[in-house]
Amino acid sequence: MANIKSAKKRAVQSEKHRLHNASRRSMVRTFVRKVYNAILTQDKKAAQQAFSAMQPIVDRQASKGLIHKNKAARYKSHLITQINKMH
């Protein structure tokens, strides 16, 4: 454990940020999973609605640096391709 006051403060802040980021990361994964599940059930309308809900969440977290912008782009590209393949 840290001995210096500022190091102790940073340790507390780091833990707080870690928990906050874990929550946000989980939220992103949940939204992506909802789109995947809609694709698996072959429900195009539900998949499009889930994608519309997921897209701003993923973009917002990418802009804040929680996930890399290329990863956000990859999520969106892969999912919209899968949705467009549905008939």
Swiss-Prot record:
Residues 1-25 are annotated as: Disordered. It holds the Pfam family Ribosomal_S20p. Keywords: Ribonucleoprotein, Ribosomal protein, RNA-binding, rRNA-binding. InterPro entries: Ribosomal_bS20, Ribosomal_bS20_sf. One of its GO terms (cellular component) is small ribosomal subunit. It comes from the Bacteria. The keyword Transcription regulation does not apply. GO terms for biological process: translation. The keyword Ribonucleoprotein applies. GO terms for molecular function: small ribosomal subunit rRNA binding; structural constituent of ribosome. Belongs to the bacterial ribosomal protein bS20 family. Binds directly to 16S ribosomal RNA. This is Small ribosomal subunit protein bS20. It comes from Baumannia cicadellinicola subsp. Homalodisca coagulata. The lineage of its organism: Bacteria, Pseudomonadati, Pseudomonadota, Gammaproteobacteria, Candidatus Palibaumannia.
